[in-house]
């Protein structure tokens, strides 16, 4: 499959062919229809994982967010099925190698949900990290009915 990836330590990202991922236990493989970009993607491409000493593997595919169609599900995955339209993100859980700027992406099942029918793939791909940040922020302050909440700097994850 084609993917934007870092082939080896010290290399710059390049578009090229890498093996298509398989679904392992607790994962979902999607055919990517759209992928979102976040500041973390540039940092990963620039070598952040190396500088932070985070375990990772090559080829290292760039990208965290995506929307697409389920191609395969691993054992233990029962909330989505082959053919479902979904959105999700790749967790930064070591060893890091998976990404979403590719024809196919393998995502942890816990980070995948069905795409609402009225939402296009491009919009859906922009939601996972930024949307999770928004939900976590609201959950953290636990607003009550009648309270006012100011959203400042809603620029995403």
Model segments located where?
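Conserved beta-strand elements of the Class I
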Residues: 4, 28-29, 150
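A local structural motif
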Residues: 10-17
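Glycine-rich beta-strand-centered segment in the early N-terminal region that forms part
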Residues: 19-37, 49-93
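NAD(P)H dinucleotide-binding glycine-rich loop of Rossmann-like/cofactor-binding domains
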Residues: 79, 88-152
């Amino acid at each position: 499959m084609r993917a934007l990836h870092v082939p080896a330590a010290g290399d710059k990202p390049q578009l090229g062919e890498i093996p298509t991922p398989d679904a392992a236990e607790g994962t979902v493989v999607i055919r990517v229809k759209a992928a979102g970009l976040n500041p973390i993607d540039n940092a990963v491409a620039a070598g952040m994982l190396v500088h932070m000493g985070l375990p990772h593997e090559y080829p290292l595919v760039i990208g965290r967010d995506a929307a697409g169609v389920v191609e395969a599900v691993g054992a233990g995955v029962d909330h989505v099925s082959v053919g479902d339209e979904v959105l999700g993100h790749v967790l930064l859980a070591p060893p890091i190698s998976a990404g979403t700027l590719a024809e196919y992406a393998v995502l942890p099942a816990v980070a995948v949900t069905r795409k609402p029918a009225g939402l296009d793939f491009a919009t859906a791909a922009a939601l996972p990290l930024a949307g999770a940040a928004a939900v976590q922020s609201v959950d953290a302050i636990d607003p009550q009915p009648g309270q006012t909440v100011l959203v400042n700097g809603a620029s995403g994850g």
